[in-house]
Amino acid sequence: MRFPSPLTEGRLVRRYKRFLADVELADGRVVTAHCANPGTMLGLIAPGRPVLLSASTNPARKLAWSWEMVQADLPGGPQWVGINTLRPNLLVAEAFREGRLPPLSGAATLRPEVRYGRASRVDFLAEGPAGPCHVEVKNCHMMREAGLAEFPDCVAARSARHMDELADVVRGGGRALLIVVVQMRAARFDVAGDIDPGFAAAFRRARAAGVETVAYACRLDPDEVTIDREIPIVTA
């Protein structure tokens, strides 16, 4: 997915109120950017870190800037990490259109935001000759061990509920798929059970029920972010 224009680099001043970040641009201006990430962003929000912002062309928007990436000092070396949790669904839709999602290779359409379960919406409903597949997408941006991407970075009760609802779909005779979009270079994925045992338990229950799970690492630069390759899920 190419950005409409190259991202603008700055340095993080502070992240606050969960969804706001002050960033100093190269010309010395300090702007407030929307931070579309409800997590703790563990290890990513130290003041002074290089960040990349996208600019909105919508004059009615309250905040003209969105925080897209941060350059993090991760185990194994520094790299750009995508923190915008609105991007993964767009990346999955793009990969589907381009035929780069093997688990959904038999689907003809991918409909977003379809109601199901206990007053929930599934991110996508894939439909085709083999029947529907409920698809949930999660963004991953945490790495505490070289090469190992982990989710979540905080207690994620809503995500745990999503896993249980996907399991209910399978128990009812349907098909369900979890796609973890890792917005950085990584070699493998695991759930962070020490941070959220509840999500880890729900993840394991869902897999045991037959929910399919797949993780994809991304390639990122100031011009583009794209799903790059599948990485193994090592959750026991």
From Swiss-Prot:
Q: Which InterPro entries match?
A: SfsA (IPR005224), SfsA_C (IPR040452), SfsA_N (IPR041465)
Tell me the GO molecular function terms. DNA binding
SS bond list: none
PANTHER family assigned: SUGAR FERMENTATION STIMULATION PROTEIN A
Provide the family line: Belongs to the SfsA family.
Which HAMAP family does its entry note? SfsA
Protein name (record): Sugar fermentation stimulation protein homolog
Q: Which organism is it from?
A: Methylobacterium nodulans (strain LMG 21967 / CNCM I-2342 / ORS 2060)
